[in-house]
Structures are given as structure tokens and as C-alpha cells.
Regions:
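Short S/T/G/P-rich N-terminal loop/turn motif that feeds into the first structured element of a domain
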Residues: 1-70, 93-95
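C-terminal structural segments of small proteins and small subunits
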Residues: 62-90
């Protein structure tokens, strides 16, 4: 079953976040992931959520998603994200 990373990202250091953005796609691809949403316009339909920059990444399974997220390849970029943005990240199983 497919699994998705859903992230709401508030960038606080643009230069470092650009560095993160340049590094992470290769790690996603290495683990079979595919970006479905990467930034772009966000329109809230209802609720109290005030989203920022939205990202959705699809993996073939939750196991593969977690292998990527906890990998050595993603560790460096993840540290850059922690330094350059405030993030809310979910892992969701889908169809």
C-alpha cells in the first residue's frame, strides 16, 4: 500500500532551505519516492489550519518511506531542514 509524507513547512532561513531543497530530491529518488506536491499555492477550504509551504511525497510502502526518513542519506538534509524551517510532518498510508 502506498504511503505519503505530508509536510507543512514554514521557512525561516531561505539560504539554508535552498541548500536543503537542492540535496533532498536525490535521496527521495534513491528510495523510490516521488514528489506529488512541492510548494505551490495553498488555499484553505475550512478549519483553523494556516498552512505554509506544503510538500507531499509518495513511496510504495510505509516501510520504504521510513527507510528513507531514517536513512544516512537523508540525515544531513534533514538537519538542514531543522535549522532552516519549522515543520509539521505526517506519515499517512493511502490507496
Amino acid at each position: 500500500m502506498a504511503a505519503y509524507v505530508i509536510a507543512d513547512v514554514e521557512v525561516v532561513d531561505s539560504a539554508k532551505f535552498r541548500e536543503y531543497g537542492a540535496q533532498v530530491p536525490a535521496t527521495v529518488e534513491e528510495y523510490g519516492g516521488k514528489y506529488l506536491v512541492r510548494g505551490g499555492a495553498v488555499e484553505k477550504a475550512e478549519g483553523n489550519w494556516e498552512p505554509n509551504r506544503m510538500v507531499v511525497i509518495e513511496f510504495k510502502s510505509m516501510d520504504q518511506l521510513k527507510k528513507w526518513y531514517h536513512s544516512q542519506e537523508y540525515d544531513g538534509p534533514m538537519q538542514l531542514r531543522h535549522q532552516s524551517a519549522n515543520s509539521n510532518v505526517l506519515f499517512v498510508e493511502g490507496v
